[in-house]
């Protein structure tokens, strides 16, 4: 992101935001609720437009492309904090619905569905309506749906919110393994610092519409500005 700024009326949301994500890197975005983390994702996928700035992927400004074209052209997968699936469909039918949009060849489509079912260990819940799945199962489903198009960039919005400790650990391990297996660039936003810093390579801290700190987890927790803006003086990862 280069010099991204956004305001709603007289309220400044983002002010000259600059950061980059390297290929195959996991980047975390930290900050309290309402600081603009999810807004950055909405800018990337095209739900809103910035007042100023550029979002560059593979040397091209994604802002030059409409929302319908953007995610497929730049291979962006998006996992929203809430929803992201068809409530009344079974888990299997959710996967089929997305595959029919993204994969033309029927054989390739079925192969990809089978792979995702196996990879996410979904065999036992294929015929359960999505609305009856647990929080962790829903999250696994939506991530699987986001991976259907083989994304190079994966956006995870508040993916640890309202989940129990064991489910969070499972998702952390899944995120790290996806990076290793697929070399995907992954961006995670969350306001729970400890959960996020346990599985990212680098992170940024947002405060007062700006990026106030960036670095590895160990660098950030010792950063004076990050402590003042977010962590506090006694924060530790473990």
Question: Residue locations for each model-derived region?
Answer:
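Helix-to-loop junction immediately C-terminal to a conserved catalytic motif
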Residues: 45
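Conserved ABC ATPase "signature" region
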Residues: 96, 107-125, 173-176
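Conserved ABC ATPase signature
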Residues: 129-133
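Conserved ABC transporter NBD signature motif
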Residues: 53-62, 71-73
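The feature captures the beta-strand-to-loop junction immediately N-terminal to the Walker
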Residues: 30-32
């Amino acid at each position: 992101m280069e010099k991204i700024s956004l305001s709603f009326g007289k309220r400044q949301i983002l002010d000259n935001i600059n950061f980059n994500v390297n290929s195959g890197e996991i980047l975390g975005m930290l900050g309290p609720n309402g600081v603009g983390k999810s807004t950055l994702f909405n800018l990337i996928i095209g739900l809103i437009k910035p007042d100023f700035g550029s979002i560059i992927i593979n040397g091209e400004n994604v802002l030059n492309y409409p929302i319908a074209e953007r995610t497929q052209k730049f291979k962006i997968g998006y996992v929203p904090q809430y929803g992201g699936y068809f409530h009344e469909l079974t888990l299997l039918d959710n996967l089929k619905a997305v595959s029919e949009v993204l994969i033309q060849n029927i054989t390739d489509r079925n192969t990809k569905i089978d792979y995702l079912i196996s990879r996410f260990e979904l065999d036992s819940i294929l015929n359960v309506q999505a609305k009856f799945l647990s929080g962790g199962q829903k999250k696994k489903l939506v991530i699987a749906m986001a991976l259907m198009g083989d994304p190079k960039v994966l956006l995870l919005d508040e993916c640890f919110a309202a989940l129990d400790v064991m489910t969070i650990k499972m998702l952390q391990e899944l995120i790290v393994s996806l990076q290793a297996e697929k070399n995907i660039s992954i961006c995670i936003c969350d306001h729970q610092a400890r959960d996020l810093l346990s599985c990212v390579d680098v992170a940024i801290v947002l405060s007062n519409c700006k990026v106030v700190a960036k670095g590895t987890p160990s660098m950030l927790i010792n950063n004076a500005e990050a402590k003042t803006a977010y962590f506090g003086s006694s924060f530790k990862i473990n």
